[in-house]
Structures are given as structure tokens and as C-alpha cells.
A protein has these predicted regions:
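N-terminal Rossmann-like NAD(P)+-binding domain of SDR-like oxidoreductases, especially those catalyzing
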Residues: 1-162
Length: 162
């Protein structure tokens, strides 16, 4: 199975890619390697995936909000699944740089939906965030809990994607 993993250099993306490779899948990883946190750690994760996978791991450093770059990198490649973990993270930073969140978390998400639609990808999994529950004080959160009062732009973008 060939799986596209966005956010492949992040902690969850890296762990997922390792697991998929361990079971024999082919993984195409995408990440923009932004400097929201330590880029060297992200590069180490990509190097580890390459070292452990033979030729079953391919990595593209790109911003999936750029549809031309996304389509170009995946031209001629058939995808069986998409696991969309990539996003501009951080609640506080969303107040300082809202355009980054609109581009990555909204436009980028639409690009991945369109990619899946045009390529007839059978399944796409999206990772949202507990931030969508806003100021909810009930713990643990439940799927039935209200998510209509986001407290940050980050939360609003994640909720919009749901």
C-alpha cells in the first residue's frame, strides 16, 4: 500500500511513517520543515526514515498549501491512502501570524481534499486537535461535546477542517 503522510517530520508523522514502513507499506512523506520547533530534529527523523526503509520512503520538502508544488511532487504517483497530520501548529503563534494558519490549515487542507478527490484515493484520515473544544471544562472531552466556540485561530482552522 502507498500512503501519503503529511507532517512526516513531526513526532506523530514520524512514528506513523515508521509503523507503516515496518508493516511493509510504501510511504511518501511531506513536510515543509518550518522552524516552529527545532529543524535539526525534523531532519534527523527524515534521515532515520530513509535509513530504515530501503527505497520504500520518499520525502518531499514542500508546503502543501502550494497546490502546484504538491501536484508536481506527486505527478504520476498512485496513492492508496492519505494521512493528513501536517498543520501550522501552535495556539499563541496563530495570533501573531494568522496568514500562516489560513494558508496551511485551511488552503492546504482543501488542497489535500482535492488531491484525494481527483486521484480517487480510497481513504483520507485527518488529525484535528483537542483545541477545537475551546474552553470546555468537562474532562475527558467527548465527540458529542460542543466545538462551536474556538478560543484561537488555530482551533478555528482545525474545526473548519472537520
Amino acid at each position: 500500500m502507498r500512503v501519503l503522510v503529511t507532517g512526516a517530520a513531526g513526532f506523530i508523522g514520524f512514528c506513523l511513517a515508521r509503523r507503516l514502513l515496518a508493516r511493509g507499506d510504501e510511504v511518501i512523506g511531506i513536510d515543509n520543515l518550518n522552524d516552529y520547533y527545532q529543524v535539526s530534529l525534523k531532519l534527523d527523523r527524515i534521515a532515520a526514515l530513509r535509513a530504515d526503509s530501503g527505497n520504500r520512503f520518499t520525502f518531499h520538502q514542500l508546503d502543501f498549501s502550494d497546490m502546484a508544488a504538491l501536484s508536481g511532487a506527486l505527478d504520476g504517483i498512485t496513492l492508496d491512502r492519505i494521512v493528513h497530520l501536517g498543520a501550522q501548529a501552535g495556539v499563541r503563534y496563530s495570533l501573531e501570524n494568522p496568514q500562516a494558519y489560513v494558508a496551511s490549515n485551511l488552503a492546504g487542507h482543501v488542497n489535500l481534499l482535492e488531491l484525494a478527490r481527483h486521484r480517487a484515493v480510497e481513504h483520507m484520515v485527518y488529525a484535528s486537535s483537542s483545541s477545537v473544544y475551546g474552553g470546555n471544562t468537562k474532562l475527558p472531552f467527548a465527540v458529542e461535546d460542543r466545538t462551536d466556540h474556538p478560543v484561537s485561530l488555530y482551533a478555528a482552522t482545525k474545526r473548519a477542517n472537520e
